[in-house]
């Protein structure tokens, strides 16, 4: 019995080794799981379910194969792929979740999220996030021709890269008070998230009790997953 969590794969055709590693993960490790949760940024960018990118179709087929084998797959949007919609969910068999979700995992309550909402010290990013998550802005963007959406997405990624290069690492990490507030709000002692690309298990105190924040790593030179069993919560790095 095990439930698996992954995040921040940033899949793109320019990184075939990561794509191949994910396909192997779906065919091997994930097949033994009770469920797979993808906590955002599965793709490097997403400009709409109508994008005919062959990679998207390949991933949908692979995830659907996992689901059809009896392993449900759940997805929380990330900051790169927040426009993944019902069409791709239907094609892949993934179940879309809200940005925060509490799971009962073998008697252990665990809060899961992508993690960008915890980075409240980065005021510039949070303001940008509020704009692009406006439903009207998203509807307008999705009405644009694909070639215009691609240009906008490329400019946004370039702007984000430039902005992040001038920010301190502390600003781009989670805010400790925000973490505690979220865990207290949801009444949990466990939190699993991605986004920061800083894999670690952090010990803290929530409601005057020991608590744990488990951060998934990004998939670059190796894969990263959290494995939850009835007896343990493990952060695991593995070769791609």
Swiss-Prot record:
Keyword annotations: Cell inner membrane, Cell membrane, Hydrolase, Lipid A biosynthesis, Lipid biosynthesis, Lipid metabolism, Manganese, Membrane, Metal-binding
UniProt-listed Enzyme Commission number(s): 3.6.1.54
Compartments in which it is found: Cell inner membrane
Reaction it catalyzes: UDP-2-N,3-O-bis[(3R)-3-hydroxytetradecanoyl]-alpha-D-glucosamine + H2O = 2-N,3-O-bis[(3R)-3-hydroxytetradecanoyl]-alpha-D-glucosaminyl 1-phosphate + UMP + 2 H(+)
Enzyme class: hydrolase
Its membrane topology: Peripheral membrane protein
Listed InterPro entries: Calcineurin-like_PHP_ApaH (IPR004843), LpxH-like (IPR043461), Metallo-depent_PP-like (IPR029052), UDP-diacylglucosamine_Hdrlase (IPR010138)
CDD domains: MPP_YbbF-LpxH
Cofactor: Mn(2+)
Principal place of residence: membrane
Pathway: Glycolipid biosynthesis; lipid IV(A) biosynthesis; lipid IV(A) from (3R)-3-hydroxytetradecanoyl-[acyl-carrier-protein] and UDP-N-acetyl-alpha-D-glucosamine: step 4/6
Recorded family membership: Belongs to the LpxH family.
NCBIfam families per the UniProt record, alphabetical: lipid_A_lpxH, PRK05340.1
Protein name: UDP-2,3-diacylglucosamine hydrolase
Taxonomic source organism: Salmonella paratyphi C (strain RKS4594)
């Amino acid at each position: 019995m095990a439930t698996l969590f992954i995040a921040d794969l940033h899949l793109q055709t320019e990184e075939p080794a990561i794509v191949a590693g994910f396909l192997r993960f779906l065919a091997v490790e994930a097949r033994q799981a009770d469920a797979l949760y993808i906590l955002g940024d599965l793709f490097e960018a997403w400009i709409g379910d109508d994008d005919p990118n062959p990679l998207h179709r390949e991933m949908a087929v692979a995830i659907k194969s996992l689901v059809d084998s009896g392993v449900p797959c759940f997805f929380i949007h990330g900051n790169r792929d927040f426009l993944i919609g019902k069409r791709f969910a239907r094609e892949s068999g993934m179940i879309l979740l809200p940005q925060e979700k509490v799971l009962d995992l073998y008697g252990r309550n665990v809060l899961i999220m992508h993690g960008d909402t915890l980075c409240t010290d980065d005021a510039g990013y949070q303001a940008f996030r509020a704009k692009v998550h406006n439903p009207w802005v998203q509807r307008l963007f999705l009405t644009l021709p694909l070639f215009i959406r691609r240009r906008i997405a490329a400019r946004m990624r370039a702007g984000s890269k430039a902005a992040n290069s001038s920010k301190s690492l502390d600003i781009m990490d989670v805010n400790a008070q925000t973490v505690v507030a979220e865990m207290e709000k949801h009444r949990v002692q466990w939190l699993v998230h991605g986004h920061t690309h800083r894999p670690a298990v952090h010990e803290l105190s929530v409601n005057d009790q020991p608590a744990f924040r488990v951060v998934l790593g990004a998939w670059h030179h190796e894969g990263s997953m959290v494995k939850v069993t009835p007896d343990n919560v493990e952060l695991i790095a593995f070769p791609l």
